[in-house]
C-alpha cells in the first residue's frame, strides 16, 4: 500500500532569514533577500539525479521526516543546524548532531502523527481504507467494528442465513437465571496473547479505527501493514485498527505464535474442536459474558441452556447468546452439568439402534436456513435419532440428518396441528379483536408474518396456538393480518 508523506508544517518566520553561505548549492547566495541567482542555483542542483534520488529517499524515511520536524520545532537545534550549514567546521557539525539528538529525545513524550490513510470525507472510505477493510473481511476479522454503545433487540424468530452476515444484530435472550443455575464468574485471565499498552491518546478518524486512552490494554490479533494493527481495546471493549506507533508492545505477534501457552482443559464431556463463527457483534457489560466482533472464531465448550453457550475467544472465557453465532455442529456440544433438580424430565426415550426407530409426523413447515437444521414440510415423516433436550430433536429425513424443534412435530413430541384458520368473517364473530402493544421487534421476511417494531399498537384477531397470534397494525387496519410471536405482545385491558 502506497502511503503519502504528511503535509509540510507551516514554516517558522525568519528560519533562513539570516544572510550567509549555503554550502553545496551556491556559496555566494544572499539569503536575507530574494535572489534570482540563488533560486536558479537551487533548481539546477535539484536536476542532478543523485541529489533528486537522495531527497526522495530521505522524504520516504519516517525517521528523517520526524527528525526534520523536531529540529524545525526546536529553536536551539534549528540554530545549531543553520550554523553548521553556514560554517561546516567539525565543531559546528558535532554541535548540530548533539542538538538534533536532544530535539529527538524531547519529542519522545509527544505522540507521533498517525499514518497517512489518504483524504476522505467523514463516513466515506478512501481507496486505502477500503483495501484494509476488504483484507479484514476476507480474513473474517472485524467486518463490523464493535462500538461501545452497540444496542440489542428481541431475538428474531426468523433464522438468519449463514451465507451473509447482517449488521443488525438480534437482541440477546433473557439473562441466564443465575439464582437457579451455578454460572462461574469469568475473571479476566492473565494476558498471554499478543498485546500492547497505549502510549498516547488516539481519536479515530474513520469508521474502522479504534480509539485509545493512555494506559489502555490492546489485544493484537492481526498486523494490517507496517503501521497499523487490528485488535481489541479491553478497557473500552471496542474493536478496530490503531497506529502501531501509539502502542508499547509487550508481547509481539511473532513471539506469541512461536510460544503459545497450553490451552486450558475443556469442561468434562465437552466437544473440543467445536467452533462457532460470530455473525453479529456482541458487547455486554454483564460480568461473565464473552464479548466478540462479527467474524470472530469462538471455541464452544458447553451449552448452558437453549439460548446461551459457553466458550473461549482471544484467550478469554465466558457465556454468550447462541443466536449471535453460526455453529453447524452445535448439537454435538453437550449441555453444561448443573446441580440435580427435582423438576420432571421432558425427554422422550429413543429406541436403541438395534431395534426399530421411532417415526414422527411433521405438523408445520420448518426452514430455518441454518445448516445444521433439517428442512421439513407439513406431513413429512421423520425418524427420531436422539433426544437432545426438552426442545430439540436430532432426526433424519430424506437421507439427511439435522436438528428439529419439537414444537413443529406431532405426538408424542408436539401437539396435533389445529384445524385450518377460519376466514376473516368467522374470526370477527368468534374472536373479537383485542388491542395490544409490541414489547419487542419482530422483523420477518416471510409474507405470512407481521413486521412489528417495538411500541407498535396492534389488533389481535386470532389466537393461532400456544406460541403465535395473528394480528395487524392498528394504523394499517386495511392491510392483511400476519403472524407474530406471543412473547413480544402485551394485551391491553
UniProtKB/Swiss-Prot annotation:
Record's compositionally biased regions (Pro residues): 1-12
Domain SH3 as annotated: residue spans: 191-252, 271-330, 355-414, 431-493
Keyword Iron: no
Record-annotated disulphide pairs: none
Listed Polar residues bias regions: 16-28
Keywords from the named record: Repeat, SH3 domain
One GO-annotated biological process of the protein: actin filament organization
Protein's UniProt keywords contain Repeat: yes
Annotated region described as Disordered, given as residue ranges: 1-28, 102-130, 142-187
Bias kind Low complexity: ranges: 154-170
Origin: domain of life: Eukaryota
InterPro entries per record: Endophilin_SH3RF (IPR050384), SH3-like_dom_sf (IPR036028), SH3_domain (IPR001452)
PANTHER family xref list: PROTEIN CBG06887 (PTHR14167:SF107), SH3 DOMAIN-CONTAINING (PTHR14167)
Protein name: Uncharacterized protein B0303.7
Amino acid at each position: 500500500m502506497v502511503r503519502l508523506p504528511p503535509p509540510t508544517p507551516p514554516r517558522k518566520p525568519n528560519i533562513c532569514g539570516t544572510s550567509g553561505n549555503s554550502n553545496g548549492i551556491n556559496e555566494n547566495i544572499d539569503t536575507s533577500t530574494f535572489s534570482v541567482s540563488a533560486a536558479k542555483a537551487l533548481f539546477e542542483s535539484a536536476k542532478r539525479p543523485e541529489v533528486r534520488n537522495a531527497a526522495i529517499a530521505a522524504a520516504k524515511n519516517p525517521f528523517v521526516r520526524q527528525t526534520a520536524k523536531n529540529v524545525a520545532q526546536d529553536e536551539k537545534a534549528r540554530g545549531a543546524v543553520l550554523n553548521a550549514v553556514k560554517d561546516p567546521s567539525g565543531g559546528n557539525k558535532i554541535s548540530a548532531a548533539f542538538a538534533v539528538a536532544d530535539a529527538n529525545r524531547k519529542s519522545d513524550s509527544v505522540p507521533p502523527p498517525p499514518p497517512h490513510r489518504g483524504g476522505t470525507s467523514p463516513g466515506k472510505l478512501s481507496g486505502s481504507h477500503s483495501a484494509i477493510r476488504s483484507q479484514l473481511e476476507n480474513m473474517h476479522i472485524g467486518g463490523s467494528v464493535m462500538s461501545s454503545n452497540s444496542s440489542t433487540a428481541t431475538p428474531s424468530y426468523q433464522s438468519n442465513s449463514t451465507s451473509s452476515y447482517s449488521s443488525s444484530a438480534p437482541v440477546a435472550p433473557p439473562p441466564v437465571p443465575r439464582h437457579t443455575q451455578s454460572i462461574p464468574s469469568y475473571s479476566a485471565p492473565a494476558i498471554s496473547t499478543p498485546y500492547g499498552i497505549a502510549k498516547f491518546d488516539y481519536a479515530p478518524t474513520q469508521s474502522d479505527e479504534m480509539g485509545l486512552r493512555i494506559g489502555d490494554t490492546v489485544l493484537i490479533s492481526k498486523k494490517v501493514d507496517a503501521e497499523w494493527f487490528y485488535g481489541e481495546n479491553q478497557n473500552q471493549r471496542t474493536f478496530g485498527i490503531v497506529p502501531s506507533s501509539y502502542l508499547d508492545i509487550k508481547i509481539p505477534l511473532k513471539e506469541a505464535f512461536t510460544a503459545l501457552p497450553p490451552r486450558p482443559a475443556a469442561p468434562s464431556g465437552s466437544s473440543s474442536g467445536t467452533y462457532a463463527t460470530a455473525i453479529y457483534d456482541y458487547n455486554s457489560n454483564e460480568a461473565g459474558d464473552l464479548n466478540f466482533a462479527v467474524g470472530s472464531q469462538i471455541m464452544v465448550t458447553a451449552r448452558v441452556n437453549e439460548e446461551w453457550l459457553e466458550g473461549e475467544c482471544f484467550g478469554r472465557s465466558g457465556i454468550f447468546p447462541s443466536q449471535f453465532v453460526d455453529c453447524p455442529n452445535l448439537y454435538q456440544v453437550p449441555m453444561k452439568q448443573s446441580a440435580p433438580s427435582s423438576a420432571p424430565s421432558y425427554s422422550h426415550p429413543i429406541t436403541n439402534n438395534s431395534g426399530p426407530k421411532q417415526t414422527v409426523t411433521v405438523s408445520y413447515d420448518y426452514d430455518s436456513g441454518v445448516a445444521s437444521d433439517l428442512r421439513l414440510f407439513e406431513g413429512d415423516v421423520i425418524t427420531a435419532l436422539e433426544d437432545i433436550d426438552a426442545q430439540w430433536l436430532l432426526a433424519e429425513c430424506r437421507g439427511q440428518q439435522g436438528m428439529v424443534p419439537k414444537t413443529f412435530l406431532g405426538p408424542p413430541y408436539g401437539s396435533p396441528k389445529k384445524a385450518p384458520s377460519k376466514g376473516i368473517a368467522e374470526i370477527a364473530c368468534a374472536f373479537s379483536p383485542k388491542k395490544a402493544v409490541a414489547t419487542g421487534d419482530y422483523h420477518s421476511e416471510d409474507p405470512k408474518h407481521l413486521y412489528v417494531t417495538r411500541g407498535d399498537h396492534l389488533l389481535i384477531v386470532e389466537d393461532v396456538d400456544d406460541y403465535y397470534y395473528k394480528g395487524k397494525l392498528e394504523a394499517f387496519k386495511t392491510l392483511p393480518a400476519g403472524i407474530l410471536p406471543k412473547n413480544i405482545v402485551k394485551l391491553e385491558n
